């Protein structure tokens, strides 16, 4: 995963 996806996962709760 990219840092952007990780940040989105932590921030939005997607869990990617």
Swiss-Prot record:
Highest taxon of source: Bacteria
Metal-binding as UniProt keyword: no
Disulfide bonds: none
Family: Belongs to the alanine racemase family.
The protein's name in its UniProt record: Broad specificity amino acid racemase
Molecular function per GO: isomerase activity
N6-(pyridoxal phosphate)lysine modified-residue sites: 6
Keywords in alphabetical order: Isomerase, Pyridoxal phosphate
Active-site residues per Swiss-Prot or TrEMBL entry: 6 (proton acceptor)
Cofactor: pyridoxal 5'-phosphate
EC number: 5.1.1.-
């Amino acid at each position: 995963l990219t840092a952007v996806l990780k940040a989105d996962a932590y921030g939005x709760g997607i869990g990617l």
